[in-house]
């Protein structure tokens, strides 16, 4: 199989990484940002077309207020510190998620990241912020319903393609590969519509330990698979894949 065009990552395990080292959760989030920087550079170096990162879920607001403040602070710091470098490296930034109820200063930062880089032609970095897939689908359905109510749309003409065109990810290809770190095996309300034919890779390492070598291993795993799209072609065995998962943490303490 050819290399993936679009990889999406659920960056999980910052808190557990910190706990295992006797550190506060905030230290795990800071380490996670360092891993994010490294992987964005690696993705660009490898010619990846699209990299989507689940940065902040719409459910994350229920976390302790101090942790939420830390996460928002890291987002703002990342954009202020890294946006110029992303722009120099020809990275285009796209933000998906609900923005209407965000604080004005956060909305301004997100808008700045998109507007500065919108002409870039390299890696498309898609940041899912205040994102929940069910909410995204509901908003798309409401948009279509308004068009129907206004007489602008015949209900019989609504198709999967039209729904896709009303999602936050309109114009972005569906992910070929979705990676989740930390050993959890669920999507957690991430790209539910778009993941219909994605390949999945659930890795045991926590996000701060994820390195370019692990990204390369994910590429190799993807190459071993046969995407069937409902067909009957065989795929690589799980035993074969297990040999190349998280090589950067082989023999290391969790």
From Swiss-Prot:
GO molecular function: ditrans,polycis-undecaprenyl-diphosphate synthase [(2E,6E)-farnesyl-diphosphate specific] activity; magnesium ion binding
Enzyme class, spelled out: transferase
List of residues binding Mg(2+): 12, 199
EC number assigned by the record: 2.5.1.-
PANTHER family to which the protein is assigned, alphabetical: DEHYDRODOLICHYL DIPHOSPHATE SYNTHASE 2, DEHYDRODOLICHYL DIPHOSPHATE SYNTHASE FAMILY MEMBER
Summary of the function given for this chain in its UniProt record: Catalyzes the condensation of isopentenyl diphosphate (IPP) with allylic pyrophosphates generating different type of terpenoids.
Protein name according to UniProt: Isoprenyl transferase
Organism: Brucella abortus biovar 1 (strain 9-941)
Gene designation per UniProt: uppS
């Amino acid at each position: 199989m050819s290399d993936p065009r679009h990889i999406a990552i659920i960056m999980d395990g910052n808190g557990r990484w910190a706990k295992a080292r006797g550190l506060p959760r905030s230290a795990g989030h800071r380490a996670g940002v360092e891993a994010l920087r490294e992987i964005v550079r690696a993705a660009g170096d490898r010619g990846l077309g699209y990299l989507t990162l689940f940065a902040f879920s719409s459910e994350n607001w229920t976390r302790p207020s101090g942790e939420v403040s830390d996460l928002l602070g890291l987002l703002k710091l990342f954009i202020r510190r890294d946006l110029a470098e992303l722009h120099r490296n020809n990275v285009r930034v796209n933000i998906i998620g609900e923005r209407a109820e965000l604080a004005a200063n956060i909305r301004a930062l997100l808008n700045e990241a998109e507007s500065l880089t919108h002409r870039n032609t390299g890696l498309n970095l898609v940041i899912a912020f205040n994102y929940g897939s069910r909410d995204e689908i509901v908003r798309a359905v409401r948009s279509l319903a308004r068009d129907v109510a206004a007489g602008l749309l015949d209900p019989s003409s609504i198709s999967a393609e039209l729904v896709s065109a009303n999602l936050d990810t309109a114009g972005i290809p569906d992910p070929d590969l979705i990676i989740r770190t930390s050993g959890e095996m669920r999507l957690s309300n991430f790209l539910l519509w778009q993941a219909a034919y994605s390949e999945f890779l659930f890795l045991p390492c926590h996000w701060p330990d994820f390195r370019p070598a692990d990204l390369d291993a994910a590429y190799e795993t993807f190459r071993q698979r046969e995407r069937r799209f409902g067909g009957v072609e065989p795929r690589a065995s799980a035993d074969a894949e297990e040999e190349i998962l998280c090589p950067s943490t082989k023999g290391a303490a969790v």
